[in-house]
Amino acid sequence: MWFKNLTLYRFNKPFSIETEALETALADFTFSPCGSQDVSKFGFSNALGKQGSTLVHSANNRHLICVTKEEKILPGQVIKESLEEKVALIEDEENRKLAKKEKDALKDEIITSLLPRAFSRRSQTRALILPELEMILVDSSSATKAEELLALLRKALGSLPVIPLSFKAPVESNLTQWLKDGSAPLPFEMQDEAELKSAADEGGIVRFKQQDLKEDEVLAHLETGKEVHKLALHFGQSIALLLQSDASVKRLKFSEEFRAGNDELGNEDPMARLDADFALMGSELVALMHALVSALGGLEETQA
């Protein structure tokens, strides 16, 4: 349940749906496994996984939701070879070249025949709805997966006025200034990893790992016009992260000490522990968002 990435969105209008109403809305779009002829299936599933029983898990007016996607695995090479064999056989028997439309129909037949025997894979994506911040935090490093979740949520609710999080000043401008200053605004602390990119299209990219970012070798690249597009940070003593210039957060990791905050509860009651961990994570992510918005100079004004 602990989030590992953050793709960030904000509401254009206040989110005011209660937990029960949200649960009811999502119930019409629940996940069901692929049938024999399904290529993929996508829907909402229990927010807390196997231990949970609801599509929405809420605490302190913070709502956790989850989508599950199942996809049949159809190797492209197998389809290609089967199609080539069938096309060659028919063209030889009928002494003519098949049209593209005929080849496409044959390909569909092959896929239909393979689907019942195909293996499938499942993936899950979670999101945290934070009405107090008018934000949605999607636990995904893929903008495509985040948009898939939001599209289904929009379908369930009828509308979902959200936009990607954007700041008054470019994120890379702030990250570059932090590197020049040798420190990030508190409570953030720079670590030993960064990616610098030239503003020019034909310019280069330089990556530093396990290196003191205050060294002249690093700072010299700023003098040539490069800007910081990725920067490893610590948020207090609780979270390690990689902040990117598109305002997304990768490699989010809660410290062992922080996650141990609910150890006194034990694991005898898994649901109670999950509930406590969710509350702990939610509170810290809210604190992280407040600090991030402040450190980056505030959010860009939205159009009403």
Curated annotation (Swiss-Prot):
Belongs to the RdgC family. GO terms for molecular function: double-stranded DNA binding. The keyword Cytoplasm applies. HAMAP family: RdgC. May be involved in recombination. This is Recombination-associated protein RdgC. It is found in: Cytoplasm, Nucleoid. The gene is rdgC. It comes from the Bacteria. GO terms for cellular component: bacterial nucleoid; cytoplasm. PANTHER family: RECOMBINATION-ASSOCIATED PROTEIN RDGC (PTHR38103:SF1). It holds the Pfam family RdgC. Keywords: Cytoplasm, DNA recombination. GO terms for biological process: DNA recombination; regulation of DNA recombination.
